[in-house]
From Swiss-Prot:
Gene Ontology biological process terms in this record: proteolysis
Positions of the catalytic residues: 47
Location of region: Protease: 40-130
Reaction catalysis annotation: DNA(n) + a 2'-deoxyribonucleoside 5'-triphosphate = DNA(n+1) + diphosphate
SUPFAM superfamilies: DNA/RNA polymerases (SSF56672)
A Pfam entry, by short name: RVT_1
Residue stretches making up the Reverse transcriptase domain: 267-447
Keywords, comma-separated and alphabetical: Aspartyl protease, Endonuclease, Hydrolase, Nuclease, Nucleotidyltransferase, Protease, RNA-directed DNA polymerase, Transferase
GO molecular function: aspartic-type endopeptidase activity; endonuclease activity; RNA-directed DNA polymerase activity
EC number per UniProt: 3.4.23.-, 2.7.7.49
Protein name according to UniProt: Enzymatic polyprotein
Domain remarks: The polymerase/reverse transcriptase (RT) and ribonuclease H (RH) domains are structured in five subdomains: finger, palm, thumb, connection and RNase H. Within the palm subdomain, the 'primer grip' region is thought to be involved in the positioning of the primer terminus for accommodating the incoming nucleotide. The RH domain stabilizes the association of RT with primer-template.
């Protein structure tokens, strides 16, 4: 309904009474043929200001319309947008007895049965207009003279197609005289000009062509790879052979290995090996593998990783990447096809990757998954390729995100990234490409209209965990998921503590009924993650803090101004446990430490801006202004003051009864423990 309302509003804004006798209004006769239908005769409007050929859904049978690969949005001069979701491919329009083929017609109710756009005029150029006729050039060899109409009608209304079916007894609706009817055409200065299109046919076609050039199911596609990414791996002790005994395999696993080894050999990412090294391969079948219906082969490189020289090149900090996309309106993302396999190993390094499986002894020609150096090697190559585009592109290992302020810029940005991929032979997965999205998944987050939250599968993992855990490894996995979502869970440190205590080395593993009840309560209180605000650079920031005997908590907020009204929006949560020595601090010092820890957590947002610290601790406001004179007993306070001096902030004291943040934290924690 919203879409229909929006479309009606756009039509109302742009409609005008059109005088068909105006020589600038070009109408010509056209004819369509469809199997099972009588000939459909139309009065077509030739509009060189419209980039696309557009038809009403009432003149082309429903079975000939298909969903567009992605919604086509057109923007008109007043800033309004129209979304086109249906297209008709490869249609023949008969004009003056000649067949004119149109690759794509777009469905939109414009008030006219058929609009012949500029793409048609370019396809059959030169297009020449006279007072009484127009000329299209067929096959660029001979002209077709077409008479202009002085009176045009619209036949495409409800029931028209039913009446046009062969042997139909339905009476054809009366045609509507366009000359006396208001129509939703876009007049001079308000029409669907090429400059005002979000995605024009020509531009989108260019993007599709570029995407096709860089996409393949083969990460070493010989027609697309440039093989510019190379790597080398070294043993700390070259004289040492790294051997791990082979594993035993079930008949089902042997059958699966047979298929996968053949696939890898066909792709030329592995080859038979005579290496003195060996590591066992095995199959995993976790949730992701079950969803795609195929087990994943993994090589246990634990021993080899201990024996090789590491690579200290780190992937970028995720928070840093998120700050780059603040305020951006439109996104596209790309995933490198089996990214590590696009990096060729030198001849000396390949024997180090040797592995055993039921089919024999093999080694990799490319960087395999499981080597500790793999993420660093790949990130370095990707940074070298895309660093120049940092203002509108970020890369996290094999994930590429393009972000822009508006649609026009985004078309250019996406084209530049795809051209760079083509230049370097970086091969992408077409299945995973997301183009021109306002809502997108990146780094495990769902980013949408200035907000972010963990993707749905994070919550699924939490809910699917059993209430009764079997061992410390299983508990570590559960706590790891909670830590991943820590920005979205207030006072997580307190929630984790009872479970984390069971991981101590000197504590034997024991899972009790009380532990099961606690696990159930934790999961019950994590039924959804709130979308948090992504602060804009111009928004004023606030941190609110709280401390108890054993824990500290903090929250980052932003003040959003909308039509003169200030709204405080939550951006992040942080929490932690005080160390053993810190638990002995005075309560004032704990409150100060809570502020410091919170600033550290959110430092990427708080440097170099002026922000507000809000606390219910009366001491902190005076503490930042005290002049300590080097008393050795107060060394900690002097250090804290010096550290805080690097930041610019004001302090606002609030009454404890007004500290809704502290109350909220306590309430959330008590819900879990009650």
């Amino acid at each position: 309904m919203d879409h229909l309302l929006q479309k009606t509003q756009i039509q109302n804004q742009t409609e005008q009474v059109m005088n068909i006798t105006n020589p600038n209004s070009i109408y010509i006769k056209g004819r369509l043929y469809f199997k099972g239908y009588k000939k459909i005769e139309l009065h077509c409007f030739v509009d060189t200001g419209a980039s696309l050929c557009i038809a009403s859904k009432f003149v082309i049978p429903e079975e000939h319309w298909i969903n567009a690969e992605r919604p086509i949005m057109v923007k008109i001069a007043d800033g309004s947008s129209i979304t086109i979701n249906k297209v008709c491919r490869d249609i023949d329009l008969i004009i003056a007895g000649e067949i004119f083929h149109i690759p794509t017609v777009y469905q939109q109710e414009s008030g006219i049965d058929f609009i012949i756009g500029n793409n048609f005029c370019q396809l059959y150029e030169p297009f020449i207009q006279f007072t009484d006729r127009v000329i299209f050039t067929k096959d660029r060899t001979y002209p077709v003279h077409i008479a202009k109409l002085t009176r045009a009608v619209r036949v495409g209304t409800e029931g028209f197609l039913e009446s046009m079916k062969k042997r139909s007894k339905t009476q054809q609706p009366e045609p509507v005289n366009i000359s006396t009817n208001k129509i939703a055409i876009l007049s001079e200065g308000r029409r669907l000009s090429e400059e005002k299109l979000f995605i024009t046919q020509q531009r989108m076609q260019k993007i599709e062509e570029l995407l096709e050039k860089v996409c393949s199911e083969n990460p070493l596609d010989p027609n697309k790879t440039k093989q510019w990414m190379k790597a080398s791996i070294k043993l700390s002790d070259p004289s040492k052979a790294i051997k791990v005994k082979p594993m035993k395999y079930s008949p089902m696993d042997r059958e699966e290995f047979d298929k996968q080894i053949k696939e890898l050999l066909d792709l030329k990412v592995i080859k038979p090996s005579k290496s003195p090294h060996m590591a066992p391969a095995f199959l995993v079948n976790n949730e992701a593998e079950k969803r795609r219906g195929k087990k994943r082969m993994v090589v246990n490189y634990k021993a080899m990783n201990k024996a090789t020289v590491g690579d200290a090149y780190n992937p970028p900090n995720k928070d840093e990447l998120l700050t780059l996309i603040r305020g951006k309106k439109i996104f596209s993302s790309f995933d490198c096809k089996s990214g590590f396999w696009q990096v060729l190993l030198d001849q000396e390094s390949r024997p180090l990757t040797a592995f055993t499986c039921p089919q024999g002894h093999y080694e990799w020609n490319v960087v395999p998954f499981g080597l500790k150096q793999a993420p660093s090697i790949f990130q370095r190559h990707m940074d070298e390729a895309f660093r120049v585009f940092r203002k509108f592109c970020c890369v996290y290992v094999d994930d590429i995100l393009v972000f822009s302020n508006n649609e026009e810029d985004h078309l250019l940005h996406v084209a530049m990234i795809l051209q760079k991929c083509n230049q370097h032979g970086i091969i992408l997965s077409k299945k995973k490409a997301q183009l021109f999205k306002k809502k997108i998944n990146f780094l495990g987050l769902e980013i949408d209209e200035g907000t972010h939250k963990p993707q749905g599968h994070i919550l699924e993992h939490i809910n699917k965990f059993p209430d009764t855990l079997e061992d410390k490894k299983q508990l570590q996995r559960f706590l790891g998921i909670l830590t991943y979502a820590s920005d979205y869970i207030p006072k997580l440190a307190q929630i984790r503590k009872p479970l984390q205590a069971k991981l101590k080395e000197n504590v034997p593993w024991k899972w009790t009924k009380e532990d099961t009840l606690y696990m159930q309560k934790v999961k019950k209180n994590l039924q959804g993650f709130p979308p948090l605000h992504h602060p804009l650079p111009e928004e004023k920031l606030i941190i609110e803090t709280d401390a108890s005997d054993d824990y500290w908590g903090g929250m980052l907020k932003a003040i959003k101004i909308n039509e003169g009204t200030n709204t405080e929006l939550i951006c992040r949560y942080a929490s932690g446990s005080f160390k053993a020595a810190e638990k002995n601090y005075h309560s004032n010092d704990k409150e100060t430490l809570a502020v410091i820890n919170t600033i550290k957590k959110f430092s990427i947002y708080l440097t170099p801006v002026h922000f507000l610290i809000r606390t219910d601790n009366t001491h902190f406001k005076s503490f930042v202004n005290l002049n300590y004179k080097g008393d050795s007993k107060l060394g900690r306070n002097i250090r804290w003051q010096a550290w805080l001096s690097h930041y610019s902030f004001d302090v606002e004291h609030i009454k404890g009864t007004d500290n809704h943040f502290a109350d909220f934290l306590s309430r959330e924690f008590n819900r879990v423990n009650s």
